Amino acid sequence: MKFAAVVVLAAAAAAVSAETNAQRMARGLPPKAPIRRHGTPADTEKRSHPSSTGGGQCNTGPIQCCNTVATSGSQSGVDELLTLLGLSVPVGTQVGASCSPISAVGTGSGAQCSGQTVCCEQNEWNGLVNIGCMPINLNA
């Protein structure tokens, strides 16, 4: 019983000692920061987590399996293909030829690639030429 009386007395003392910002400013003190008692809609929204970029992830589209990956301007035959298709690519850009998307990484036959696995920025002519390719390792 004594414990309950002490708790009630402490709660009453805490409630009495709370002063308003108007009282603080009247005494020449700065106002206290506002207390947020309820969450804002932004606080209560479900937070999404960004996907990882490692381990076979590709942010620009599906992972591609290309038979040939070469640098434009390196006399590798890719330049002739780009010219025939009427595509203008800056010198030094990685270009993949004869590419097909890899649908399911790590499961079944969809993850098999006998060429080079790449992540490309631009897919032209239905996989015949992929521009802006970067080799990736599916085993990472």
Swiss-Prot record:
Coiled-coil features, chain-numbered ranges: none
CDD domains for the chain: hydrophobin_I (cd23507)
Source domain of life: Eukaryota
Annotated S-S bridges: 58-119, 65-113, 66-99, 120-133
UniProt signal peptide: 1-18
Induction details: Expression is not regulated by ammonium and glucose concentrations. The introns present in the gene are required for the proper heterologous expression in the ectomycorrhizal basidiomycete Hebeloma cylindrosporum.
Record GO terms (molecular function): structural constituent of cell wall
Gene Ontology cellular component list: extracellular region; fungal-type cell wall
Location of region: Disordered: 22-60
Intracellular or extracellular location(s): Secreted; Secreted, Cell wall
Alphabetized UniProt keyword annotations: Cell wall, Disulfide bond, Secreted, Signal
InterPro entries xrefs: Hydrophobin, Hydrophobin_CS
Chief localisation class: secreted
Subunit comment: Self-assembles to form functional amyloid fibrils called rodlets. Self-assembly into fibrillar rodlets occurs spontaneously at hydrophobic:hydrophilic interfaces and the rodlets further associate laterally to form amphipathic monolayers.
Sequence similarity: Belongs to the fungal hydrophobin family.
Biological function: Aerial growth, conidiation, and dispersal of filamentous fungi in the environment rely upon a capability of their secreting small amphipathic proteins called hydrophobins (HPBs) with low sequence identity. Class I can self-assemble into an outermost layer of rodlet bundles on aerial cell surfaces, conferring cellular hydrophobicity that supports fungal growth, development and dispersal; whereas Class II form highly ordered films at water-air interfaces through intermolecular interactions but contribute nothing to the rodlet structure.
Listed name of the protein: Class I hydrophobin 1
Phylogenetic classification of the source organism: Eukaryota, Fungi, Dikarya, Basidiomycota, Agaricomycotina
